[in-house]
Amino acid sequence: MATGKTSSAANLFTGSTRFDLSSADSPPSKLSLSSDQLNHCHQALGVFRGKIQNPDSIAHEFTGLQANRMWPSELLLNSTVAMNSVNVEKNRYSDVVPFDKNRIVLNPCKDSSAKGYVNASLIKTSESESISQFIATQGPLPHTMEDFWEMVIQQHCPIIVMLTRLVDNNRTVKCGDYFQDEDGPREFGNISLTTKWIKTTDTSLMLRNLEVNYKETEDQPMSVLHIQYPEWPDHGVPKDTVAVREILKRLYQVPPSLGPIIVHCSAGIGRTGTYCAIHNTIQRILAGDMSALDLAKTVALFRKQRIGMVQTMDQYFFCYNAIVDELEDLTAGTNAGTSS
């Protein structure tokens, strides 16, 4: 970790439309928080620490979330486009599909009968330009990779967070290889992809600077930072919160106005929902939105936008632990009511 290097948290709340990838492979810099932001973090830390000291209350929250989860019959009624016969094979899992109301729509798309379908959901807690929006999506299938990259271009997504391996330890395919590990172009239909560089961090994150563009265009290619954390087990949690929080630290300086952050695992709900909940909670606390202290309400809102977000009790506890660890980092060496 670089020492003595700080950057202002103000970048989180600007309307900038630029993101410089030239230093994306450097260690994330420490945020310099305002006195108000420090006070918000101290207040939130007290609340979340109190919750962790009473694990039964956290378990009770998750049990309540599970009791109110959507039933399969409701999913059928709310996901008619996903269940259309022309789109069924585009779903990695038949019981994890986007709702009609907030699905990402590809426009134009090659097949009008598909109604621009891609298994991806827009996830947000507000319309504020200071808070990131996410696209929660499944790991692309071999026949949906072009759709995935079409979505990246159309939605102007500067970041892809990948929380899975391509193949798990049981040799089960969890995600299609929609990028490449060697230099040189790769084509997905009318889309060309080039890997500019690949870096591995001390926390096992793999960083890729990708450039994507339509093949027959004179426009400048779009730069995308691809962050992969392959050590997060399916349906489980990492042994600690360090790598997951490093992803967040690397994204602090990405202006939300650039476009949604794509987050995916295999199904796009468990690990994906967990990361989105952590990122969203910390970001809202820094923005002074103290309703973020109600994690159950945040997850419930996410589940209204994509079924099953934060899939297991362990993942829900991991959210609490990661939030506390990050708040402790942000407030290290300071006291409540001070900015030093």
From Swiss-Prot:
Tell me a GO biological process for this protein. negative regulation of defense response
Mutagenesis or variant effect for S7D: Disrupt binding to MPK6
Top-level class of the enzyme under EC nomenclature:
hydrolase
Protein modification: Phosphorylated by KIN10.
User: Matching Pfam families, A to Z?
Assistant: Y_phosphatase (PF00102)
Identify the domain of life.
Eukaryota
Q: Tell me which UniProt keywords the record has, alphabetically.
A: Cytoplasm, Hydrolase, Nucleus, Phosphoprotein, Plant defense, Protein phosphatase
A Gene Ontology molecular function term of the record = kinase binding
Instruction: Please tell me where this protein is predominantly located.
Output: cytoplasm
Q: What is the effect of changing C265S?
A: Loss of activity
Where substrate is bound, by residue?
D234, C265, S266, A267, G268, I269, G270, R271, Q311
Q: What induces it?
A: By salt treatment. Down-regulated by cold.
**In the record, which residues are listed under signal peptide?**
none
Question: Domain named Tyrosine-protein phosphatase: which ranges?
Answer: 58-326
Please give the tissue specificity annotation from the record for this chain.
Expressed in roots, stems and flowers, and at low levels in leaves.
> Which PROSITE patterns does UniProt cross-reference here?
TYR_PHOSPHATASE_1, TYR_PHOSPHATASE_2, TYR_PHOSPHATASE_PTP
Q: Where is the active site?
A: C265
The record's Gene Ontology cellular component field reads:
cytoplasm; nucleus; plasma membrane
Functional summary from the UniProt entry = Protein-tyrosine-phosphatase that dephosphorylates and probably inhibits MPK6 in non-oxidative stress conditions. In association with MKP1, represses salicylic acid (SA) and camalexin biosynthesis, thus modulating defense response. May also repress MPK3. Dephosphorylates and inactivates MPK4 in vitro.
Q: How does it assemble?
A: Interacts with MPK6. Interacts with KIN10.
Q: What PANTHER family does its record include? A: RECEPTOR-TYPE TYROSINE-PROTEIN PHOSPHATASE (PTHR19134), TYROSINE-PROTEIN PHOSPHATASE 1 (PTHR19134:SF449)
> What protein name applies here?
Protein-tyrosine-phosphatase PTP1
Species in which this protein is naturally found: Arabidopsis thaliana (Mouse-ear cress)
